[in-house]
Amino acid sequence: MPAAAQKSAHQSQSATQSTIKVLYGESDENTLSAQAAEMTKAGHHVTTALNRQGVQEALRRDAFDLVILGATLSKDDRHHLPYMVKKSHEGTKVLVMHAGTHHHEVDAAIDPSLSMHRILEKIAALIAATK
């Protein structure tokens, strides 16, 4: 492949994988650190939050493009936190890692048993839809 074509292909690939600010919350530290590391490898700036209180504190400190509520958070947390996200930062997208979420403040849900590759694809699609 000619150098100009390689450069063009690289630019279009990196344009589709733009860096976003993600707040990722879980109740299990091991899950939180492992999943956050994968998101960081994909090029996202990830802030982690442990439990509901951690998510609330992070929302008070900063604004995010996307808030991901992980599967180890309680059902109650996954229900109430989307309201808090939208109230704190109206334009922030909310992705819940739970197969059966139907919530009007949630922008997308994904089954947490899917591979990290599929989760990263869902993140990219959700962000691309807002541009």
Regions found by a protein language model. Give the residues of each.
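Acidic phosphotransfer microenvironment of two-component signaling modules
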Residues: 29, 50-54, 114-117
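CheY-like receiver
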Residues: 41, 57, 83, 87, ...
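A generic structural motif
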Residues: 42-46
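Acidic, metal-coordinating helix/loop segments flanking the phosphotransfer/catalytic sites
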Residues: 48-66
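Conserved phosphotransfer cores of two-component systems
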Residues: 60-62, 84-91, 100-101
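Conserved phosphotransfer microenvironments
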Residues: 68-86
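Output/docking surface of receiver
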Residues: 95-131
